[in-house]
């Protein structure tokens, strides 16, 4: 089977998911993707470029797989009639209805509606966790209340009926070659390996660390994770306060070095306010870190 995998947001967990699918699927995965350029622009502007990229795809496509950042109706109209009759599957890494907003920023319903239309256009929706699916289905009727005239709720059941849960695959074998190094630690090593962004709630993470430090508890830190977004000031303050106890600071490009860091950590922490299936936390657990995560 030839599967065209469309990813307008080729970064982080989206990137890991697609690369894992390419590597391990028994089907022929044909990826077209765009690099990270901001959520709003990708949801608005991705379809024109992606539709153009399909002209280079010569294979007969049996299934269309798109991510939740795709403007599916626009993509289908710009490529019509090529993909009109084949099954269309959308993988819901996240949704625009419940994703937290930065402080002082209101949710723009435009992107909820783009997400909503794309879900209606897909034949099957795959959510990354049961919590994610339930969280979205709870928020959808509240969104439909915003309609200024006739309010149609039948799409809620329609979307629910074509939704399933399938956890993203994890490529963990790449961590097996690394030897466990945590026995060499003089102090407990606490790991942060998620995005440096507000929805990961770094303020709470460092607030707890500061309290531990205030009562003279000693620990070392590995502060890794994706840093291409705007860096919260908490990380710079942490460098000033804990510099000599920070064994790594910043994104890790090299896979071997990343594996070495995870195999030297004792505890991995998430304080995220918005998370459905954190690949980074799973990787750290696989490498032997004890998880402290939200309920």
Show which residues each predicted segment covers.
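Conserved donor-binding/catalytic core segment of Leloir-type glycosyltransferases
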Residues: 167-171, 181-213, 221-222
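Aromatic "clamp/platform" in nucleotide-sugar-dependent glycosyltransferases that forms part
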Residues: 273
């Amino acid at each position: 089977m030839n599967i065209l995998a469309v990813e307008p947001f080729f970064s982080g967990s989206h990137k890991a998911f697609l690369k894992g699918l390419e590597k391990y699927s028994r089907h022929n995965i044909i990826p077209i993707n765009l690099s990270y350029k901001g959520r709003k622009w990708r949801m608005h502007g991705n379809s024109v470029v992606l539709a153009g990229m399909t002209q280079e795809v010569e294979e007969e496509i049996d299934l269309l797989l798109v991510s939740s950042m795709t403007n599916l109706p626009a993509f289908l109209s710009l490529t019509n009639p090529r993909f009109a009759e084949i099954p269309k599957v959308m993988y819901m890494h996240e949704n625009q209805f419940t994703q937290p907003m930065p402080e002082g920023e209101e949710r723009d319903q435009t992107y909820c509606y783009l997400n909503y239309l794309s879900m209606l256009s897909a034949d099957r929706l795959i959510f990354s966790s049961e919590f994610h699916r339930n969280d979205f289905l709870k928020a959808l009727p509240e969104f439909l209340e915003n309609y200024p005239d006739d309010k149609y709720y039948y799409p809620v059941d329609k979307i629910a009926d074509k939704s399933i849960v399938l956890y993203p695959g994890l490529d963990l074998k790449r961590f097996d070659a690394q030897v466990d190094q945590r026995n060499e630690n003089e102090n407990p090593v606490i790991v942060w390996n998620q995005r440096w962004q507000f929805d990961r709630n770094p303020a709470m993470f460092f607030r707890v660390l500061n309290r531990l430090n205030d009562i003279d508890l000693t620990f070392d830190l590995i502060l890794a994770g994706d840093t291409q977004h705007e860096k919260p000031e908490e990380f710079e303050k942490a460098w000033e306060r804990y510099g000599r106890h920070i064994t790594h600071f910043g994104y890790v490009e090299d896979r071997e070095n990343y594996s070495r860091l995870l195999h030297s950590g004792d505890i991995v922490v998430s304080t995220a306010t918005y998370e459905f299936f954190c690949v980074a936390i799973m990787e750290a657990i696989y490498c032997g870190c004890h998880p402290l995560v939200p309920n």
